């Protein structure tokens, strides 16, 4: 956040049909929103601002009078204007609105993301309503949109929001280029929070699941059941502006194995195409691991089906574990990430950043994961135990 009013970014457009004093007022409100909470900041005098922006004194006067009417600033005894300490609270209002950026039509977004999207959306909407706030989906401009179109989108929506939540990148293509997201990140006047990922900006917060606890619990179970040689099957990620926490999952699995005294004998990243053949190659290795930890439950299902087609039995010939924990499947051991809790924490972070600003203390929040047992990790002849159906 800025520590003072940044007048360099205020550029009223004389060609616009919108009156100059309204443009100036909106720009000043944006700058006030960018200030840290409870900061005493004086405004430039009407005369100085008029000279700086090449505007009439009457234009700056009308913009300042509107700020006074909004009760965002107060007049001091020397007639100068000071930003009120409660200005941000007044902007928030009694019914806050949080925007969730999505790169496509909402129905298509849910259809494309299916099982992964719904728990996050439930958490976002549920927590928002509990805080007497509204959560709205905002379809971002297309990647081909011009900078002016992207700014028009921000000008239309951001002034009425207390924050924005990012579910991922805004480009539909797996490329490092994400021009819409890159431009929207320049708007420091509004809190921005990422779910299950991060962005390379100090003014953006992140809420993620910490894989360490769940993986450590699983590693202890592997040791108790006599497993020692473990493999990790990940997936390839192309570099993108939005950094998904899932990109670090394979490394987190390998670190957990090492940390818990287990041997990681294989690490393989599946390609986007030809995954079936890649899995077959892993399963036919003469040094095939005793256990395979998979990037997610979908990958584990693919490994399971491929193994079965090759005559391999799970868990008799190969033990298996997934990640992200599909509800209602007691067969597959997995790591539960609680997406609803992550989404709720993101809403809480937006409200916290709006009221108190962002700092090193509240920029990142990690929620613990937990191991959920399944029959796929049962080792015949070593342990006889019932696998509890503790998935919700």
Residue ranges and their predicted role:
Residues 1-55, 62-65, 115, 155, ...:
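Extreme N-terminal segment that seeds HTH/winged-HTH DNA-binding domains in transcriptional regulators
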Residues 18, 22-29, 34, 38, ...:
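Amphipathic helical "hinge" segments at domain boundaries
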Residues 42-48, 75-88:
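Short, Lys/Arg-rich nucleic-acid/phosphate-binding segment
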Residues 99-101, 158-171, 231-234, 267, ...:
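Periplasmic-binding protein-like
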Residues 170-213, 298, 324-333:
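Flexible loop/hinge segments that line or gate small-molecule binding clefts
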Residues 203-233, 273-281, 337-356:
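Hydrophobic alpha-helical segments within soluble ligand-binding/sensing domains
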Residues 216-262, 266-267, 359-378:
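An alpha-beta-alpha
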Residues 276-392:
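Flexible loop/turn connectors
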